[in-house]
Amino acid sequence: ARKHLIKTNVESLQKLYPRAEIVCTITDTYGNIADAVNDENRKCIDYIYTAMSELGIKPNTIAMRGGTDGSYISTQGILTPNYFTGGHNFHSNCEFLPLLALEKSCQMTLKLIELIAKG
């Protein structure tokens, strides 16, 4: 929607100032993991919810950017969904990770390995 708005604004400016050369080039540099989800790779997300259920963790699903590596890899066909770390105040000088959250995140990782190994 934002890209369309920008292009529409450029077109409006071109009509308003026909002698001006106005060029707009939009290049995607950061993909959305959600755009990469399909029926073929959805299983890895299902594993996350199964692991959380088996560990008694209540999911709180939110849309978020997961970092450039994961976003790029996902757009290349290898889905890399995020699951919790339990951290707080990300990318600030007050960022912290409670020990209990670290423990749960570690249990989650081990449970995912177990589920994936079972198939």
Where are the model-predicted features located?
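Metal-dependent amide/peptide-bond hydrolase catalytic core
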Residues: 1-119
